[in-house]
Amino acid sequence: WCASGCRKKRHGGCSC
């Protein structure tokens, strides 16, 4: 999961 305010990336990981 990703912290609030962050989006999941298709290849995996999060973008904040």
Curated annotation (Swiss-Prot):
Superkingdom of the source species: Eukaryota
PTM annotation: C-terminal amidation is necessary for channel blocking activity.
Annotated localization: Secreted
Modified residues (Cysteine amide): C16
GO molecular function terms attached to this record: calcium channel regulator activity; toxin activity
Tissue expression as described in the entry: Expressed by the venom gland.
Family assignment from sequence similarity: Belongs to the poneritoxin-Ae1 family.
Protein name in the entry: U1-poneritoxin-Ae1a
Organism encoding this protein: Anochetus emarginatus
